[in-house]
């Protein structure tokens, strides 16, 4: 007689084994109708699997985070059900849940088209309307192999080969279609309503380009129609803001096949990059960082000693010279330790903060590359703080202030913070892990910050804090991080002399605010829709002549503005002024200055903001004053 304990502490006794659905039914018909699955002793379980012993049970509906993930996973199986009915000689690979949706990788000689997406979506809708039950079959490995051999599902058989002999495998039966999954899934298709198939893309089995080429169908699903519509609106807005499109439109950068994952910065984009670098350099200087520069190519012996050769070798670019193998650095930390190691260090010298705008290369798979967001060559705003155990909390606390200051400058007010603690496999004593985790926790709590704990998610060499931005489309971008490292200073012989005149290894804090310049600029392009605030814009002001008579004044003002340290350009084409204003607006120039006969007569410009607001008549001294104010507050002119 299982005794079921519910979240409110109440208990229900059943005479025999009982399912989640039956428990829900005993509470109320409405709850039973809404039940998708359950959590039994903190483990997710299908709604129709019997519970035989005393358990703590949480009933899951579409209102729960787990519920919507189960709905999305079930929709992935519906893709399989639909394509198997429509197309012949299809083999299903994997169909996981991803953020805001799901996908299924499919092997087929037939190439799917956007028209096929519509056809598949229509078939899914037909299947949903039949309200069929999704059956779960728990079978042995042998039975699972037999099932998928009969169906000639090559990829499923490969997955089964990797599963241990003992235990049962969950098969989910959607009428005539059978798929394999850990589950859980919805008990009936009536729970599957609000979805949309989004796009097609290519992929490889297991993400390896040497394996079979697959076709990926992406989709999204939500609990409510409004949530689906809101998401599709966000997707549409995201496409408008796509940094790759805007980068091309505004001549910021490009990427070409001869150098995949590496950026060709155009003058406009490089200006943004340089302004960003200058700003970060000022922040670093103000906070007592020492800027350094380290080599691009380093003998593999250093990477072997640091441990990167063993873990990262496949992701490194290498080159050979005079019988020596060099790695193009994928990260900066081992090189920073080499600088720390030059000369004897005392505890009185600590903390030492070494910063570098370090250019790194990583051999990312070509299929994973994505504009500025995922590249092979990137520059980190990287720094390493060498300190004592006792200094960790203060250094982390100061860094948190720095992160919030920088993010606020760019208009990011919603910051998500996650603290990752010790994993099972780790180096260092329990004592230093305790001290480090306590230091990071106190640094966060002393600032009354909301943060999320990620137990066991720290690196093997120390705990870390991650900082993620939420943008105008509610997308989350992980950018900043501060990571405690006990291991690398030991591996690379970094030492200082303590108060007792004994040599000790410092703690090293890896930290970055932006993450990488390339990715952060990509985020900014999409956040601002390329309407950069005046301090960051490639050109801060454009001067427009109304007639040919005003060209000379335009050119003279342009020279004076540029000579005073601002970024200015002119449009002196023989075009109507309305057309020029429209072109300047489409070009996203923050300030538009018009010079006609009236303005020239009083040695001034008629100024307007990018949003069309008339700012008035300005002579050059007043224009400079306004621009200085706008640049100083790092704001937009709108």
Swiss-Prot record:
<dbReference type="Pfam" id="PF07973">
    <property type="entry name" value="tRNA_SAD"/>
</dbReference>
<dbReference type="InterPro" id="IPR002320">
    <property type="entry name" value="Thr-tRNA-ligase_IIa"/>
</dbReference>
<protein>
    <recommendedName>
        <fullName>Threonine--tRNA ligase</fullName>
        <ecNumber>6.1.1.3</ecNumber>
    </recommendedName>
</protein>
<dbReference type="InterPro" id="IPR012947">
    <property type="entry name" value="tRNA_SAD"/>
</dbReference>
<dbReference type="GO" id="GO:0046872">
    <property type="term" value="F:metal ion binding"/>
</dbReference>
<dbReference type="GO" id="GO:0006435">
    <property type="term" value="P:threonyl-tRNA aminoacylation"/>
</dbReference>
<keyword id="KW-0436">Ligase</keyword>
<dbReference type="InterPro" id="IPR004095">
    <property type="entry name" value="TGS"/>
</dbReference>
<comment type="function">
    <text>Catalyzes the attachment of threonine to tRNA(Thr) in a two-step reaction: L-threonine is first activated by ATP to form Thr-AMP and then transferred to the acceptor end of tRNA(Thr). Also edits incorrectly charged L-seryl-tRNA(Thr).</text>
</comment>
<dbReference type="Pfam" id="PF03129">
    <property type="entry name" value="HGTP_anticodon"/>
</dbReference>
<dbReference type="InterPro" id="IPR045864">
    <property type="entry name" value="aa-tRNA-synth_II/BPL/LPL"/>
</dbReference>
<dbReference type="InterPro" id="IPR018163">
    <property type="entry name" value="Thr/Ala-tRNA-synth_IIc_edit"/>
</dbReference>
<dbReference type="GO" id="GO:0005524">
    <property type="term" value="F:ATP binding"/>
</dbReference>
<dbReference type="InterPro" id="IPR002314">
    <property type="entry name" value="aa-tRNA-synt_IIb"/>
</dbReference>
<dbReference type="GO" id="GO:0005829">
    <property type="term" value="C:cytosol"/>
</dbReference>
<keyword id="KW-0820">tRNA-binding</keyword>
<keyword id="KW-0030">Aminoacyl-tRNA synthetase</keyword>
<feature type="region of interest" description="Catalytic">
    <location>
        <begin position="242"/>
        <end position="533"/>
    </location>
</feature>
<comment type="similarity">
    <text>Belongs to the class-II aminoacyl-tRNA synthetase family.</text>
</comment>
<dbReference type="GO" id="GO:0000049">
    <property type="term" value="F:tRNA binding"/>
</dbReference>
<keyword id="KW-0479">Metal-binding</keyword>
<feature type="domain" description="TGS">
    <location>
        <begin position="1"/>
        <end position="61"/>
    </location>
</feature>
<comment type="subunit">
    <text>Homodimer.</text>
</comment>
<dbReference type="GO" id="GO:0004829">
    <property type="term" value="F:threonine-tRNA ligase activity"/>
</dbReference>
<dbReference type="InterPro" id="IPR004154">
    <property type="entry name" value="Anticodon-bd"/>
</dbReference>
<keyword id="KW-0547">Nucleotide-binding</keyword>
<dbReference type="Pfam" id="PF02824">
    <property type="entry name" value="TGS"/>
</dbReference>
<keyword id="KW-0694">RNA-binding</keyword>
<feature type="binding site">
    <location>
        <position position="510"/>
    </location>
    <ligand>
        <name>Zn(2+)</name>
    </ligand>
</feature>
<feature type="binding site">
    <location>
        <position position="384"/>
    </location>
    <ligand>
        <name>Zn(2+)</name>
    </ligand>
</feature>
<keyword id="KW-0963">Cytoplasm</keyword>
<dbReference type="InterPro" id="IPR012676">
    <property type="entry name" value="TGS-like"/>
</dbReference>
<dbReference type="InterPro" id="IPR036621">
    <property type="entry name" value="Anticodon-bd_dom_sf"/>
</dbReference>
<feature type="binding site">
    <location>
        <position position="333"/>
    </location>
    <ligand>
        <name>Zn(2+)</name>
    </ligand>
</feature>
<dbReference type="Pfam" id="PF00587">
    <property type="entry name" value="tRNA-synt_2b"/>
</dbReference>
<keyword id="KW-0862">Zinc</keyword>
<keyword id="KW-0648">Protein biosynthesis</keyword>
<dbReference type="InterPro" id="IPR012675">
    <property type="entry name" value="Beta-grasp_dom_sf"/>
</dbReference>
<dbReference type="InterPro" id="IPR033728">
    <property type="entry name" value="ThrRS_core"/>
</dbReference>
<keyword id="KW-0067">ATP-binding</keyword>
<dbReference type="InterPro" id="IPR006195">
    <property type="entry name" value="aa-tRNA-synth_II"/>
</dbReference>
């Amino acid at each position: 007689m299982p005794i079921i304990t519910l979240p409110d502490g109440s208990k229900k006794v059943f005479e025999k084994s009982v399912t989640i659905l039956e428990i829900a039914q005993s509470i109320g018909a409405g709850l039973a109708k809404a039940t998708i699955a359950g959590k039994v002793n903190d483990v997710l379980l299908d709604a129709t699997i019997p519970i035989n012993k005393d358990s703590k049970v949480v009933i899951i509906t579409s209102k729960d985070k787990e519920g919507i993930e189960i709905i999305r996973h079930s929709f992935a199986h519906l893709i399989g059900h639909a394509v198997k009915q429509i197309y012949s000689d299809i083999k299903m690979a994997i169909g996981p849940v991803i953020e805001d949706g799901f996908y299924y990788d499919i092997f087929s000689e037939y190439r799917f088209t956007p028209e096929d997406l519509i056809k598949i979506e229509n078939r899914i809708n037909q299947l949903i309307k039949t309200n069929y039950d999704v059956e779960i079959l728990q079978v042995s490995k042998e039975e699972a192999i037999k099932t998928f051999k009969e169906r000639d599902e090559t990829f499923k058989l490969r997955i089964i080969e990797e599963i241990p002999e003992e235990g049962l495998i969950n098969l989910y039966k959607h009428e005539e279609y059978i798929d394999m999954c850990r589950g859980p899934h919805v008990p009936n298709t009536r729970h599957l309503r609000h979805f949309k198939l989004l796009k097609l893309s290519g992929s490889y089995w297991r993400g390896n380009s040497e394996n079979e080429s697959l076709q990926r169908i992406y989709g999204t699903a939500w609990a409510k129609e409004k949530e689906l519509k809101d998401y599709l609106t966000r997707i549409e807005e995201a496409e408008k803001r796509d940094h790759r499109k805007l980068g091309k439109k505004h001549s910021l950068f490009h990427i070409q096949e001869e150098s995949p994952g590496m950026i060709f910065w155009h003058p406009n984009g490089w200006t943004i990059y340089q302004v960003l670098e200058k700003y970060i350099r000022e922040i670093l200087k103000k906070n007592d960082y020492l800027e350094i520069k380290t080599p691009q190519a380093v003998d593999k012996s250093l990477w072997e000693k640091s441990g990167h050769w063993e873990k990262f070798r496949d992701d490194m670019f290498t080159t050979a010279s005079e019988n020596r193998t060099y790695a193009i650095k994928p990260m900066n930390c081992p090189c920073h330790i080499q600088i720390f190691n030059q000369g004897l260090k005392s505890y009185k010298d600590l903390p030492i903060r070494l910063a570098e705008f370090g250019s790194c290369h990583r051999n990312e798979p070509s299929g994973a590359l994505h504009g500025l967001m995922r590249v092979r060559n990137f520059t980190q705003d990287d720094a390493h703080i060498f300190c004592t155990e006792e200094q960790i909390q203060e250094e982390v606390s100061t860094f948190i202030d720095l992160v919030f200051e920088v993010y606020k400058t760019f208009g990011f007010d919603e910051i998500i913070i996650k603290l990752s603690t010790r994993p099972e496999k780790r180096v260092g004593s329990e004592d230093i892990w305790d001290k480090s985790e306590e230091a990071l926790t106190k640094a966060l709590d002393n600032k009354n910050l909301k943060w999320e704990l990620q137990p066991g998610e720290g690196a093997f060499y120390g705990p870390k804090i991650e900082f993620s931005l939420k943008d105008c489309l509610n997308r989350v971008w992980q950018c900043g991080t501060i990571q405690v490292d006990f291991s690398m200073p030991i591996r690379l012989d970094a030492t200082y002399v303590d108060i007792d005149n004994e040599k000790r290894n410092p703690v090293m804090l890896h930290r970055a605010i932006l993450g990488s310049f390339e990715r952060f600029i990509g985020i900014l392009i999409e956040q601002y829709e390329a309407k950069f605030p005046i301090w960051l814009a490639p050109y801060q002001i454009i001067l427009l002549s109304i007639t040919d008579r005003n060209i000379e004044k335009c050119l003279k003002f342009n020279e004076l503005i540029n000579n005073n340290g601002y970024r200015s350009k002119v449009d002196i084409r023989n075009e109507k002024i309305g057309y020029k204003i429209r072109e300047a607006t489409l070009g996203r120039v923050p300030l538009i200055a018009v010079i006609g006969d009236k303005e020239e007569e009083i040695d001034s410009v008629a100024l307007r903001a990018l949003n069309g607001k008339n700012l008035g008549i300005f002579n050059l001294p007043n224009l400079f004053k306004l621009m200085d104010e706008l640049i100083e507050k790092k704001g937009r002119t709108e």
